[in-house]
Regions:
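Residues in the helix-turn-helix
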Residues: 165, 248
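Accessory beta->alpha helical hairpin/"wing" motif in late/C-terminal subdomains of nucleic-acid enzymes
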Residues: 167-177
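Structure-specific DNA junction-binding interface
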Residues: 1-135, 146-148, 153-157, 168, ...
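Positively charged, polyanion-binding regions of nucleic-acid-associated proteins
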Residues: 225, 273-291
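Linker/hinge segments immediately adjacent to helix-turn-helix/homeobox DNA-binding domains
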Residues: 119, 181-210
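Short Lys/Arg-enriched helix C-cap and helix-to-coil transition segments
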Residues: 177-193, 260-275, 328-341
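Short, Lys/Arg-enriched anionic-surface-contact patches
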Residues: 126-138, 201-221, 263-278
Length: 341
């Protein structure tokens, strides 16, 4: 095997003890290998090897590399030589400060206040018929339940809250946060001095670990989907194969189409039992209402009471999404043809 990349990393195991490790990538006859070698503190000649990846996909190997390296750096390891395949992101000052506020909120939020804000979000989302995350993310509610603003001026110092959002929901938030006791005041510059650089860096790598894990899972899911579609599998079989819900599978199929892959074989299979006239009615509804929202199309085609079907209402939405993939593909093709002149 030919070693094409190697780096050494270290971390402090105690006040005076330093641990070393080696990260390597090798290739032999088109097969990529990625590994980690721990060296004993007491005996340099003693080592423990861990094979992280072995296979033919360079892209998958890179995903594994980034994820596993982020895990190790989150545990305190740092490369002795920067660069290579390691991505070192330089954060602007404002971005770094906002991330420090997020870090602090994940460790010191008041759970009772957070729970009350979550209850508000559920009720308001239901009354507005919106997804809860559209009102406020978990991250934002953590920030609110940590720093406990008492005025609109303080509220606007929370990352993610602008004038419009403060005007829309600020009174509701302040009704919860302003009555909770707090120990520290605004402005929040004291947070930046209270957080140690090393603990913050480890937390940043934990965030990267989660990000790269999602990327790796998505890459492997896409590969399984494409292989399954090529093999003639339907949604239910792919669900059993991947352990992913049918809704998540449909979202992944939409993304694959955006990336230039064809999922038409699966669409044909899933729509075999749907009458051609019914499919045409859905298509015309997309032409009339656009393809952003499914509910207007559903009501246009089926009225207020869609016909009963095995799988309930969800099967109707699945078919709408599958036809929407075709519709968007044709619309994109028409746009490309128009702009080529």
């Amino acid at each position: 095997m030919q070693i094409i990349f190697m780096n050494r990393l270290s971390r402090m195991a105690g006040r005076e003890e330093e641990e070393f490790a080696q990260l390597w990538i090798g290739e032999e006859e088109g097969v990529w290998s990625l590994g980690w070698r721990d060296f004993s503190v007491n005996a340099v000649l003693e080592s423990t090897d861990n094979l992280w990846y072995e296979g033919g996909s360079w892209n998958e190997m890179l995903c594994v590399y980034r994820h596993e390296l982020a895990v190790k750096m989150g545990a305190g390891y740092r490369p002795l030589i920067d660069g290579g395949l390691h991505e070192e992101e330089v954060l602007p000052r404002r971005g770094r400060e906002q991330l420090k506020l997020q870090y602090y909120s994940e460790h010191y939020s008041q759970e009772s206040v957070y729970d009350e804000l979550c209850a508000w979000r559920r009720g308001r989302a239901s009354s507005e018929r919106k997804a809860p995350y559209m009102l406020a993310s978990n991250r934002l509610l953590r920030l609110l339940s940590t720093f406990l603003p008492k005025t609109t001026e303080e509220l606007l110092q929370i990352p993610g809250i602008g004038e419009a959002k403060a005007a829309q929901y600020g009174a509701d938030w302040l009704a919860v946060t302003s009555v909770a006791p707090r120990e520290r005041d605004f402005p929040l510059s004291w947070v930046y001095e209270e957080i140690g650089d090393e603990e913050f860096s480890s937390w940043l790598y934990k965030q990267k670990e989660l990000k790269y894990k999602r990327q790796l899972e998505q890459l492997r899911l896409n590969r399984t989907l494409l292989q399954g579609i090529d093999g003639g599998l339907g949604l239910e079989q792919l669900k059993n194969e991947t352990g992913v819900s049918r809704r998540e599978l449909l979202e992944a199929l939409e993304e694959l189409e955006k990336d230039g892959y064809s999922v038409e074989k699966l669409i044909e299979l899933e729509l075999e039992s749907m009458a051609h006239e019914e499919q045409q009615a859905v298509w015309k509804a997309y032409e009339e209402f656009g393809d952003l929202f499914l509910k207007p199309v559903l009501y246009k085609v089926y009225g207020d009471t869609p016909p009963a079907a095995a799988g309930g209402l969800e099967i109707h939405y699945e078919r709408l999404r599958l036809i929407r993939i075709r519709f968007r593909r044709e619309q994109a093709g028409s746009l490309d043809s128009a702009t080529s002149f």
